[in-house]
Amino acid sequence: MLKEFREFAVKGNVIDLAVGVIIGGAFGKIVTSLVNDLIMPLVGIIIGGHDFSGLSIKIGSAQILYGSFIQTVIDFLIISFSIFIFIRYLNKLKRKKVEEEEVVETPDQTEVLLTEIRDLLKHQSQSKDVQ
């Protein structure tokens, strides 16, 4: 059972997935910092000096932090757009690879003539053997 697990864990897809999850987690932290520390303060200045993280509505004893929600939505949009651009780039590379594989080499005129001469000589040789 340990051997089977080792074979499973060493497969390229599992390792790629693990690396992707780790990098994705780190990327998420970078985007969160970008939104919280750079984008939202600039947006706050543009719309009148508001700090979005502190925006809230108090209803009874409940406090609804909609500013934090706005920041989370912006995080999501930036991460989604970044992933979209990355996947689009990967798909473009895959299409280019497929197109390169589909290109069929057409023999040049010299090759065609040499092939015809070879076939004619082979045919003549077989005709002489039959006689």
From Swiss-Prot:
Channel that opens in response to stretch forces in the membrane lipid bilayer. May participate in the regulation of osmotic pressure changes within the cell. InterPro entries: Mechanosensitive_channel_CS (IPR019823), MS_channel (IPR001185), MSC/AndL (IPR037673), MscL_channel (IPR036019). It is a multi-pass membrane protein. Gene3D superfamilies: Large-conductance mechanosensitive channel, MscL, domain 1. GO terms for cellular component: plasma membrane. Pfam families: MscL. GO terms for molecular function: mechanosensitive monoatomic ion channel activity. SUPFAM superfamilies: Gated mechanosensitive channel. The gene is mscL. The lineage of its organism: Bacteria, Bacillati, Bacillota, Bacilli, Bacillales. It is found in: Cell membrane. PROSITE patterns: MSCL. Keywords: Cell membrane, Ion channel, Ion transport, Membrane, Transmembrane, Transmembrane helix, Transport. The chain crosses the membrane at residues 14-34, 67-87. This is Large-conductance mechanosensitive channel. Its main location: membrane. Homopentamer. It comes from the Bacteria. Belongs to the MscL family.
